[in-house]
């Protein structure tokens, strides 16, 4: 601090895990700020301080003590969370800033689980939010320890994605659907692994999201070809052509909505978040189709999936018309969670 010669300094403890957004927030403040977290042995703090001796208590044994001293002397203010921009567009959710002290292995494991849970998207499908997390967690933890790069997981997922298509077309449903579910789970694993290990890359994002956009209609064509026995004039294959058009139209609507509001159509309002749980997307359609195949209703399920895609696109069309030219800040209010805190609180007991 003394070497800073009056320049601002952000003080961190080596035994803490800090939210990168909090560091950026502190760096943009103009005065001394402190941020506290935890209780008892896990109480910790980070301090944004000017590099001058009058504001620095050299007798402080740790940053929490220093922060307390600065507050008592009026030399700093606590971080005002109303000024903190907690919305994460990529995750479609609000996360409060976090700061944790790693006191032992138990605390480390709790923090790791918190980071895992807080990296789930706020608006996503039922399978991703309720079915896959236990399996994804059991995969992400050892992969992180083994330092497996998330791009490796992404590439394995891509191989599974397109290897499933000829199996679908041949009516080899068991191996095809096995590969499909492997890809579906790995699609959650690579993103969580990248964010937890801070190894996200533009190339990985491109491969991951590019595959997500391209492969669903290819799968649907494969399903229809397998159901029809290779008859391009069959009703089910003709329905797959309609599915392609509706799918592309729906994706265009999602992009238009983001252009006109600055937000994802999937989390603009609470109703959008709820509907995203069951709207027509790959994971939901995959689960429905597999169950239908098991009871001999593959054709009926496929027609239902096409109809559900059409209803999803219609709802998105209504939302685009409804909010076209609207205020980009509209709908940004923080959603309250049951305990009265802001969604994404860093209280570990919530996870």
Label the model's feature ranges.
Residues 15-25, 52-56:
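Short acidic, S/G/P-rich loop/turn micro-motifs used as interaction or catalytic elements
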Residues 19-41, 224:
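Conserved donor-nucleotide/metal-binding helix-loop-beta segment in metal-dependent transferases, i.e.
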Residues 41-47, 51-140, 209-351:
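A feature for the membrane-embedded catalytic helix bundles of lipid/isoprenoid biosynthetic enzymes
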Residues 137-145, 191, 195, 205, ...:
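Short amphipathic alpha-helical coupling elements at transmembrane boundaries
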Residues 150-203:
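Membrane-embedded alpha-helical segments that form the functional core of polytopic membrane enzymes
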